[in-house]
């Protein structure tokens, strides 16, 4: 099982006024199905939306992020970002579940199980 690190990519051109390029860890877990919007910075239980997520592995990250023109999905390592379709992205996710909140930050933690063999094969085919 891998932990999901929720992140937001901010953009000054957007009406929300966030800082471009600033990456902020999200405050609450959210389902990986569908494409959430970037309306605000409220936790999901308060009507907010997650607008970025990242599935970390030892060598690379399976990433979904908002580039202000809509979502792009891909597989990133230290040097490259390989774009993929939403369907390909979701095909790597085998299991998703919420776990308890972080006692220090109060943030909701989530846990996912991903198909690491499939992730490696996908990346190797494009490297």
Feature annotation, model-predicted:
Residues 1-127:
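Nucleic-acid endonuclease domains
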